[in-house]
From Swiss-Prot:
Domain of life of the native organism: Bacteria
PANTHER family in the cross-refs: PENICILLIN-BINDING PROTEIN ACTIVATOR LPOA
Name assigned to this protein: Penicillin-binding protein activator LpoA
Transmembrane segments: none
Family indicated by similarity: Belongs to the LpoA family.
Any one biological process term the GO annotation gives: peptidoglycan biosynthetic process
Length: 586
């Protein structure tokens, strides 16, 4: 009897671990492994890290979790097809994994602009079932949907909700930066008319944006206003983590000029170009008591000029103009250490260098302006017709980049070598759905192109660059170009001004020289507010060549003026009073 009992106990000892193992296995299938719970937390690694884990992991549940983490991060890296591929591989998910998958799918829909689908997917998710990290992702998707609909205020409100569930400082900073970007891109009138409805955080953001916009061109006042705001909203998220764009204002010092070095080619074949720019620069600074030292870059090397300027105690330089000299500085930034430099050109090698900005009349500015203008005019399938040369390639690249930002697709680009190629380029590039054409051509070529387009589709919206604007355009030519729009510098808006008539006479009505004069004029405006321009986000200068602002690497960006041929005359379009009469010569 005793032996039988002992055998029974031995059997229990043998089977008990097995039973426990099966029980635990059942719990894992039902509840998921402890690693699955990591889906409730932030995914802080790169997609490459999670993809490597997928390749190394044998456990099926953990493998599914790593695929979800990889897909989540791939969406934030804008690698949507890869994310979708990992989601498609998932099988036999537990409840925690299904929940996280639904969040990722909603995020993908929002990124793709499928707003209704994303909203429906979110409606199936119960907020109470989400962890704080997952709730922050939920509201990020809500914000993205609102952004897709150009409803910045709703996007900001969602970002405020998102902030409540963020614990990581870096993520909070990123969220504040994005909230601030939305505020900066919202029309001032919309901000002023938005009711915070008792939401103290929203009220703080709106007030911050309004104060910033109101004091943008008064830097000293702006800094004091920001300090006052922080005292009024001491517990606000932005008071603890000021948007990155605003953090540099604490060290801002107003521009003070005593001596300036102006570097231009003033002899040889480029003398006329250099002298015209200098004339504009001199006219702009006429009322300022600042000593200007002029250096001829055709007689001295750029290294010699910089060394000479330093010996003379000059710490601010305008120039050089020639690209090879700009490249010398770009490749040897130590040359201009401790100097403020406004280069009057840019090159493909241009990069961010402390206290250096690049300014020039580049075709990229016009191409980007054209893409934005066509988008605003509801053009969605444009054809871009450009010459097969450096100008054409630069224009095409800049237009395509801007179009991708606006619509997420490439623009249809067609090149031509000579006038005889234009007819073929147009017929091969146009489709029934094409609704606008951007043309880079001279005045004569433009007329020929328009004649072809009028025969193919007279309803197309036509746009051109300043290259086609010529003083030789008579009434008949202007009438033929009726309704065509083109970009140019705002200096051409008022031909009756004393300044215009003076420069018209000085340059013998040569438009290319008038552009250079305007560039020289604006070079003074820029260097005279150089610190403000570089350090205050959104700071703009209304110049003769456009509304000037600092872009990436401190490339000076120009907001162009658009004109239109109407019944033999030319009118500026982006003015409040479009009835301004510009040209009507008989």
């Amino acid at each position: 009897m005793l032996s039988i009992l002992m055998q029974g106990l031995r059997l229990k000892k043998c089977f008990l671990p097995i039973l426990v193992m099966f029980f635990l296995a059942g719990c894992v299938n039902l509840l998921g492994s402890s690693f699955t719970a990591s889906l409730k937390n932030d995914a802080n690694a790169s997609s490459d890290f999670y993809i490597r884990k997928i390749e190394q992991t044998q456990n099926q549940q953990d493998l599914q979790t790593y695929k979800l983490l990889a897909a989540r991060v791939l969406v934030t890296e804008n690698k949507i097809p890869q994310a979708e591929a990992y989601l498609a591989e998932l099988i036999d998910l537990n409840d925690e994994q299904k929940l996280d998958k639904s969040l990722i799918e909603a995020h993908i829909s929002a990124v793709k602009g499928k707003n209704e689908t994303a909203e429906y997917q979110l409606s199936l998710i119960h907020l109470t079932s989400l962890s704080p990290s997952q709730k922050s992702r939920y509201y990020e998707i809500v914000s993205r949907i609102a952004e897709n609909r150009h409803d910045n205020i709703s996007a900001i409100k969602a970002r405020i909700q998102m902030d409540n569930f963020l614990s990581d400082i870096q993520r909070k900073q990123q969220n504040n930066d994005r909230t601030w970007a939305l505020l900066r891109n919202t029309d001032s009138e919309v901000l002023n008319n938005t009711d915070a409805e008792g939401n103290i955080t929203l009220s703080g953001w709106l007030t911050l944006a309004q104060l910033y916009n109101d004091n943008l061109n008064q830097p000293a006042q702006l800094i004091q206003t920001l300090l006052t705001w922080k005292n009024y909203y001491p517990t606000h998220t932005a008071a603890h983590l000021l948007p990155t764009e605003l953090q540099g204002l604490a060290n801002f010092q107003q521009t003070t000029l005593t001596q300036v070095g102006l570097i231009l080619p003033l002899s040889g074949n480029t003398r006329l170009i250099g002298e015209t720019i200098k004339n504009g620069f001199d006219d702009a600074k006429v009322n300022y008591n600042v000593q200007v030292h002029v250096f001829d870059s055709m007689k001295m090397s750029i290294e010699q000029i910089i060394n000479q300027a330093k010996k003379q105690g000059i710490n601010t330089l305008v120039g050089p103009l020639l690209k090879q000299n700009v490249d010398v500085i770009v490749n040897n930034p130590y040359l201009v250490q401790d100097l403020n430099v406004l280069a009057l050109n840019s090159t493909p090698n241009a990069r961010a260098i402390e206290h250096l900005c690049y300014y020039g009349l580049s075709p990229e500015d016009e191409a980007e302006s054209a893409a934005s203008k066509m988008w605003n005019d509801t053009v969605r399938i444009p054809l871009v017709l450009v010459p097969q040369n450096n100008l054409g390639r630069r224009t095409a690249a800049a237009f395509t980049l801007r179009w991708q930002q606006l619509l997420g697709t490439d623009a249809n680009i067609k090149f031509y070598n000579q006038t005889a190629d234009i007819n073929f380029a147009l017929k091969s590039g146009l489709s029934e759905s094409t609704d606008g054409v951007y043309i880079i051509a001279n005045n004569k070529q433009l007329a020929e192109i328009k004649a072809v387009l009028d025969n193919i589709n007279p309803t197309l919206k036509l746009y051109a660059s300043s290259r086609s604007n010529s003083p030789n355009s008579g009434p008949e030519h202007r009438l033929f170009l009726n309704n065509l729009q083109f970009s140019d510098i705002p200096f051409f808006k008022d031909r009756e001004s004393e300044q215009y008539k003076k420069i018209e006479k000085m340059t013998n009505n040569d438009y290319s020289l008038m552009h250079l004069y305007a560039m020289g004029y604006d070079a003074w405006l820029l260097i005279n507010q150089f610190n403000e321009f570089r350090q205050i986000p959104g700071f703009t200068i209304d110049g003769l060549t456009g509304k000037l602002s600092a872009g990436p690497n401190c490339n000076v960006e120009r907001d162009m003026t658009w004109f239109q041929y109407q019944n033999g005359s030319i009118y500026p379009l982006n003015e409040q009073d479009d009835s301004i009469y510009l040209i009507n010569e008989e």
